[in-house]
């Protein structure tokens, strides 16, 4: 479908004009008298059916501004006749046809002299009619002295934007009736190029309204082009559309400002948060209880028993270690460097409170070593490493006398009894191995003594040792004598323990609680064996399972790794004890 584009001239002109249909060759010549009917009733009919060569359908892209021109005031022509007086901009020319406003927005780049205008702006190098016309040359030199004078004056300076009437101080078209619009100053025109606002729409409406007063354009609003009032409705104006995307921006800006722009306020809290979890700004990721740095995260939860030295564990056999914690801290102060590594490796594990010295430098892979011993956190790495390479003389002697960790252990007991022993400190475990003795609380001693006497030599009485909060069992010993309630060993970390009995250590190895947690004791509210108190008896059948796991477990660490460390600490404790005794005298 294509409609013929008619070249029109005023009635006074009798010459023939060419009719173009979007093609290069000319159609039949006709007289302008033949088109009289179209001037009154169907002036805009040709707009209804755009040629198929148009790059888009004008009906889809209706111009937002009316065309304030009249067919009676000037002729339509692309052949270089008198200029067209419509105030909207010229678009790209396609085969001699005008594309008005839509082309001004959507047209493709053209050839030289046919640059598409932007948003209705006049093309400054626009050659109407033929390529001989140029705004830089005089009209006489181009062979269009009079007819193109309006174009020369109009395009020599940028006319108003967006189809507005030419304001004061600018050259007008040949028919100057539309050149000047009252109420629009040159300052207003300049503002239209700076912003798109509601007043611009109003100004355009005024301009278009003035042009529509001409006689020949009565029916233009009925065509595909929407009426002026609906062309730029206030709710859907460009200004309103531009505001919508702008609204979310302020919301995003404050957020960005908080993180970036507001460096003065946010940075301090961020820095504080980062420093909270570190110790001595060493960057150690360990977040051990801030109150007691000595309690770094432990590898395994031996038992839900809470604090380092839980008072409820009155039965813990060696509460003697409570005073020790402060001393070891002093001794081990120079060696805290190894501790951060250990703490980091054991941090992911549950209830990381205390880490055995042997596990601090190398990292305890088996969730072992955590106890209520709060003191030797940093020292162990130094002493542990040498101990692993060089065996302490005392340890060599003990290993020569005793057959630790035997492979032929008979864990399938027919007769016998098994008890859990909880110690406050691994120092006391070291002394128990060294001196082959043990001492529990007053209540614990009575219970163990009664059990030992009840067996009457018919079966062994095994003790399963574990340090509070260590997360592992550290070994198994057999009770070898009744309790001597009046004896005082004088070797424990605390001097308050009274009584002793002999033991023989069979297994000295770290067995993580996760290896035994599945075994539950029916005589202890069905709690796991790892969640037991001092001198808690283990039923024989469950005891067999525990002994089998401990005997067959392939350990990688044991208290023997820290034997030299505990030897040194014992010497320091004895020196301090002698000093106190001298002061008392």
From Swiss-Prot:
GO MF: N6-methyladenosine-containing RNA reader activity; ribosome binding; RNA binding
Polar residues composition-biased segments: 15-24
Assigned protein family: Belongs to the YTHDF family. YTHDF3 subfamily.
GO BP: mRNA destabilization; negative regulation of type I interferon-mediated signaling pathway; organelle assembly; positive regulation of translation; regulation of mRNA stability; regulation of trophoblast cell migration; stress granule assembly
PROSITE patterns named in the record: YTH
Protein name from the UniProt record: YTH domain-containing family protein 3
UniProt keyword terms in alphabetical order: Acetylation, Cytoplasm, Phosphoprotein, RNA-binding
Low complexity composition-biased segments: 329-350
One matching Pfam family: YTH
Major localisation: cytoplasm
One of the record's GO cellular component terms: cytosol
Entry-annotated residues carrying N-acetylserine: 2
Entry annotated with the keyword Kinase: no
Function of the protein: Specifically recognizes and binds N6-methyladenosine (m6A)-containing RNAs, and regulates their stability. M6A is a modification present at internal sites of mRNAs and some non-coding RNAs and plays a role in mRNA stability and processing. Acts as a regulator of mRNA stability by promoting degradation of m6A-containing mRNAs via interaction with the CCR4-NOT complex or PAN3. The YTHDF paralogs (YTHDF1, YTHDF2 and YTHDF3) share m6A-containing mRNAs targets and act redundantly to mediate mRNA degradation and cellular differentiation.
Positions of region (Disordered): 1-51, 244-277, 304-350
Disruption phenotype: Mice are viable and normal in size but display increased interferon-stimulated genes (ISGs) levels and are resistant to several viral infections. Mice lacking Ythdf1, Ythdf2 and Ythdf3 display early embryonic lethality and show defects in embryonic stem cell differentiation.
Species of origin: Mus musculus
Gene field: Ythdf3
Organism lineage: Eukaryota, Metazoa, Chordata, Craniata, Vertebrata
Composition-biased stretches (Basic residues): 244-254
Location of this chain's protein in the cell: Cytoplasm, Cytosol; Cytoplasm, P-body; Cytoplasm, Stress granule
InterPro entries: YTH_domain, YTH_prot
Protein residues bound to RNA: 422-424, 428, 438-439, 468, 492, 497
């Amino acid at each position: 479908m294509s409609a013929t584009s008619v070249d029109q001239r005023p009635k006074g002109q009798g010459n023939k004009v060419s009719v173009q249909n979007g093609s290069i060759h000319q159609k039949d010549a006709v007289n302008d008298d033949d088109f009289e009917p179209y001037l009154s009733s169907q002036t805009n009919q040709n707009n209804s059916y755009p040629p198929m060569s148009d790059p888009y359908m004008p009906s889809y892209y209706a111009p937002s501004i009316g065309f304030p021109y009249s067919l009676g005031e000037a002729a339509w022509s692309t052949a270089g006749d008198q200029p067209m007086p419509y105030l909207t901009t010229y678009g790209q020319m396609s085969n001699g046809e005008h594309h008005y406003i839509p082309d001004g927005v959507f047209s493709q780049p053209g050839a030289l002299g046919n640059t598409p205008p932007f948003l209705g702006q006049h093309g400054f190098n626009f050659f109407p009619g033929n390529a001989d016309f140029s705004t830089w040359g005089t009209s006489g030199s181009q062979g269009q002295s009079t007819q193109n004078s309006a174009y020369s004056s109009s395009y020599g300076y940028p006319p108003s934007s967006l189809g507005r009437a030419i304001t004061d101080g600018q050259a007008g078209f040949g028919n100057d009736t539309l050149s000047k619009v009252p109420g629009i100053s040159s300052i207003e025109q300049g503002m239209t190029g700076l912003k798109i606002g509601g007043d611009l729409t109003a100004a355009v409406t005024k301009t278009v309204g003035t042009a529509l007063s001409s006689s020949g354009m009565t029916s233009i609003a009925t065509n595909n082009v929407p009426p002026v009032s609906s062309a730029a409705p206030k709710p859907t104006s460009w200004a309103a559309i531009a505001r919508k995307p702008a609204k979310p921006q302020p919301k995003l800006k404050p957020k960005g400002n908080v993180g970036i722009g507001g460096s003065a306020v946010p940075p301090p809290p961020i820095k504080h948060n980062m420093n909270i979890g570190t110790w001595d700004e060493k960057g150690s990721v360990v977040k051990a209880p801030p109150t007691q740095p000595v309690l770094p995260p432990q590898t395994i939860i031996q038992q839900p028993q809470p604090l380092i030295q839980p008072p409820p564990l009155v039965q813990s056999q060696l509460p003697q270690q409570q005073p020790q914690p402060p001393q070891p801290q002093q001794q081990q102060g120079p060696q805290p460097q190894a501790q951060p590594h250990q703490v980091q490796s054991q941090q992911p594990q549950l209830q990381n409170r205390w880490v055995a010295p042997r596990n601090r430098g190398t990292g305890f892979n088996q969730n072992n070593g955590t106890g209520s011993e709060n003191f030797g956190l940093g020292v162990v790495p130094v002493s542990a490493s040498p101990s692993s390479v060089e065996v302490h003389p005392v340890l060599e002697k003990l290993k020569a006398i005793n057959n630790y960790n035997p492979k032929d252990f008979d864990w399938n007991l027919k007769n016998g009894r098994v008890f859990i022993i909880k110690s406050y400190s691994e120092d006391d475990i070291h002394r128990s191995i060294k001196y082959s003795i043990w001492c529990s609380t007053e209540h614990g001693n009575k219970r163990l003594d009664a059990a030992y006497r009840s067996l009457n030599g018919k079966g062994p009485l095994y003790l399963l040792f574990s340090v509070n909060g260590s997360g592992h069992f550290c070994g198994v010993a057999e009770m070898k004598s009744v309790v001597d309630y009046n004896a005082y060993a004088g070797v424990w970390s605390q001097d308050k323990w009274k009584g002793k009995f002999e033991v023989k250590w069979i297994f000295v190895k770290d067995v993580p609680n996760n290896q035994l947690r599945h075994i539950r004791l029916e005589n202890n509210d069905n709690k796991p064996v790892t969640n037991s108190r001092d001198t808690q008896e283990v039923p024989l059948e469950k005891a067999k399972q525990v002994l089998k796991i401990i005997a067959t477990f392939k350990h990688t660490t044991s208290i023997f790794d820290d034997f030299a460390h505990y030897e040194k600490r014992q010497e320091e404790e004895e020196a301090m004890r002698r000093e106190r005794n001298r002061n008392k005298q």
